[in-house]
UniProtKB/Swiss-Prot annotation:
Catalytic residues as annotated in Swiss-Prot or TrEMBL: K131 (schiff-base intermediate with substrate)
Subunit structure: Homodimer.
Sorted UniProt keywords: Cytoplasm, Pentose shunt, Schiff base, Transferase
Annotated InterPro entries: Aldolase_TIM (IPR013785), TAL/FSA (IPR001585), Transaldolase_1 (IPR004730), Transaldolase_AS (IPR018225)
Catalytic reaction equation(s): D-sedoheptulose 7-phosphate + D-glyceraldehyde 3-phosphate = D-erythrose 4-phosphate + beta-D-fructose 6-phosphate
GO cellular component, one term: cytosol
PANTHER family per UniProt: TRANSALDOLASE
Pathway where it operates: Carbohydrate degradation; pentose phosphate pathway; D-glyceraldehyde 3-phosphate and beta-D-fructose 6-phosphate from D-ribose 5-phosphate and D-xylulose 5-phosphate (non-oxidative stage): step 2/3
Class of this enzyme: transferase
Pfam families the UniProt entry points to: TAL_FSA (PF00923)
CDD domains: Transaldolase_TalAB
Gene Ontology terms for molecular function: transaldolase activity
Name of protein: Transaldolase
Length: 315
């Protein structure tokens, strides 16, 4: 049995891509997209009809150019999601504009709009996850959305404080990042790490065990991998979202895969939820998490703006 098939027996495998052909090839349960993946997918020729449809939709909705641009980017993200949902049996994650990461109300409004576009296309809420950056404001937005039956995927998660606050808010799923944590430590500590000592692996392992220890139902979906070793070291995690090159590497490897995450300890009483002040104090004790959350939001916002430039030229 290859490692990808072995992994599927202990973990739900998700494709981290907007590339429909790659998704078709590796047959994941779910798929995740983000502004950067939507931007790169939009450059593929087979996506031209989806872009054209988004432009037509936007023009039919408003005569205002600025509003057309907003409507076109939302519709394009949903169009790509709809194509992916024809292939995956589970859920698609579609991301809220990263520029709303510190605005609870705008995040909620955008999430409702994206869900509405999916619903208009005949897709029920139980096939969609709304991706939101795991800022305090984003977590509060997710708490409200979850109560409305809109499940959320809290992303750009780098600290234990972020993970704890998400669980306490009743968030459906979190995406703790592995590879970007490794990137920070390699750049700042100037050293290499074996897979078992990888700071990203250690972080996700701690989050997974914390959730199981306190019986939180929030799903842990490891994300952002730099190598196969990071994946195999957290085999057994609830879900893992993996880019096509690493799905390929797993499918081509027949090395034995051992389950690494499998909490068997006692279940403890949950602590009182973090206050906003406690959240910021704990999150800001971790310079890596502070750097990578801010950088991740900036990068997604830059790619959102590049996508807008591409769409604006067509409006």
């Amino acid at each position: 049995m290859n490692q990808l098939d072995a992994l599927r027996e202990m973990t739900v495998v998700v494709a981290d891509t907007g590339d429909i052909e790659a998704i078709r090839q590796y047959q994941p349960q779910d798929a995740t997209t983000n502004p950067s993946l939507i931007l790169s997918a939009s450059a593929l020729s087979q996506y031209a009809p989806l872009i054209d449809d988004a432009i037509r939709y936007a023009k039919s909705k408003s005569g205002n150019k600025a509003q057309q641009l907003v409507d076109a980017e939302d519709k394009l993200a949903v169009n790509i999601g709809l194509e992916i949902l024809k292939i995956v049996p589970g859920r698609i994650s579609t991301e809220v504009d990263a520029r709303f990461s510190y605005d609870t109300e705008k995040t909620i409004a955008k999430a409702r709009k994206l869900i509405g576009l999916y619903n208009e296309a005949g897709v029920a809420n139980n096939r969609i996850l709304i991706k939101i950056a795991a800022t305090w404001q984003g977590i509060r937005a997710a708490e409200i959305l979850e109560k409305e039956g809109i499940n959320c995927n809290l992303t750009l998660l780098f600290s234990q404080a972020q993970a704890r606050a998400c669980a306490e808010a009743g968030v459906y799923l979190i995406s703790p990042f592995v590879g970007r944590i490794l990137d920070w430590y390699k750049a700042n500590e100037k050293k290499e790490y074996a897979a078992a000592e990888d700071p990203g692996v250690i972080s996700v392992t701690a989050i997974y065990n914390y959730y199981k220890q306190y019986n939180y139902k929030t799903i842990v979906m490891g994300a952002s991998f730099r190598n196969v070793g990071e994946i195999t070291e957290i085999a057994g995690c609830d879900r893992l979202t993996i880019a096509p090159p690493l799905l390929k590497a797993l499918a081509e490897s027949n090395e034995t895969l051992v389950r690494k995450l499998d909490y068997q300890g006692e279940i403890l009483d949950r602590p009182a939820p973090l206050s906003e002040a406690e959240f910021y104090w704990q999150h800001n004790q971790d310079p890596m998490a502070v750097d990578k959350l801010a950088e991740g939001i900036r990068k997604f916002a830059i790619d959102q703006e590049k996508l807008e430039e591409m769409l604006s030229a067509k409006l």
